[in-house]
């Protein structure tokens, strides 16, 4: 097993989210964004100044993407919304599915500007979710019978997508059209983690094609080569890290969200940093997230 590198980073936000998720970074404003899904909150952090804000939401938001300097796309249990960055006003943009018991979970923007977004049951009901492709307002279902969609990310050339169903805990890869982000083949197994500690959660793919994956329940971020070889493990000071994001002026730092979901009082006392947001404390070769293309 790859040796675990001790945590050498810092806490970016002490606000403990029940389910911190969906971090991203807007290089135009130098601002990191993430969600407390179950708390119906959108968190904002200006990295240079340290200025923080928490925006209440009327839904369970999980993924944010920049559209342009004045607009953001948010995925939620009620569909896709456009958020005005100045007024925080929300406008409905598209419906993902007609399943009121579901919510959005993990997702990411492909280099072509399309969105891959996963849905799941609010209580992680078996096979209740799916993974969708969104191009403008056109929604296409890609994969059904997903329990907990996660690890959605794309290779730098846009020709490969990665994803998992955390309930199965197998990291998958699939060839896709770089121009559209639509699959051109069937998913194949990249790494079987079904007998390994923790769950394969959110992931990002760096400029070298390495996959940085948050390992829920294992207090770590793990790094894979495109062939599935695990090459590094970095400790996170919380048991349930949920998703990473590249941040900083050159996307050279790694932010990681976490969660205290499912913990009783004793577990939370033993895990005092659960739900906080961290910087890993290492230099990475990250990539900025593309804008969503309307």
UniProtKB/Swiss-Prot annotation:
**Molecular-function annotations in GO:** calcium ion binding; gluconolactonase activity
Keyword check for Hydrolase, yes or no: yes
List the Gene3D superfamilies. Answer: TolB, C-terminal domain
Q: Name one Pfam family in it.
A: SGL
GO biological process terms, alphabetically, are: L-ascorbic acid biosynthetic process
* Homology family: Belongs to the SMP-30/CGR1 family.
Which named protein is this? Putative sugar lactone lactonase
């Amino acid at each position: 097993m790859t040796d675990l590198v001790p945590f050498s980073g810092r806490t970016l936000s002490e606000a403990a989210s029940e389910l911190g998720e969906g971090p991203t970074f807007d290089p135009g404003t130098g601002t990191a964004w993430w969600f407390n899904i179950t708390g119906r909150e959108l968190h904002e952090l200006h990295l240079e100044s340290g200025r923080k804000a928490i925006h209440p939401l009327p839904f369970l938001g999980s993924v944010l993407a920049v559209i342009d300097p004045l607009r953001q796309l948010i995925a939620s249990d009620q569909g896709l919304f456009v958020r005005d960055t100045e007024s925080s006003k929300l406008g409905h943009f598209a419906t993902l599915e007609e399943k009121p018991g579901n919510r959005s979970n993990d997702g990411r923007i492909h280099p072509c500007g399309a969105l891959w977004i996963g849905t799941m049951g609010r209580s992680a009901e078996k096979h209740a979710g799916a993974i969708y492709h969104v191009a403008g307002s056109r929604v296409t279902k890609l994969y059904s019978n997903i329990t907990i969609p996660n690890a959605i990310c794309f290779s730098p050339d846009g020709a490969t997508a990665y994803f998992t169903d955390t309930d199965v805990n197998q990291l998958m890869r699939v060839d896709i059209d770089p121009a559209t982000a639509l699959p051109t083949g069937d998913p194949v197994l990249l790494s079987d983690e079904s007998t390994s500690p923790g769950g394969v959660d959110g992931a990002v793919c760096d400029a070298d094609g390495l996959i940085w994956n948050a390992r829920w329940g294992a207090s770590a971020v793990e790094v894979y080569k495109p062939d599935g070889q695990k090459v590094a493990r970095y400790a996170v000071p919380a048991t349930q890290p949920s998703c990473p994001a590249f941040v900083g002026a050159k996307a050279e730092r790694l932010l990681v969200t976490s969660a205290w979901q499912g913990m009783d009082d004793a577990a939370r006392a033993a895990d005092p940093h659960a739900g906080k947001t961290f910087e890993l404390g290492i230099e990475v070769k990250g990539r900025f997230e593309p804008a969503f293309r309307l």
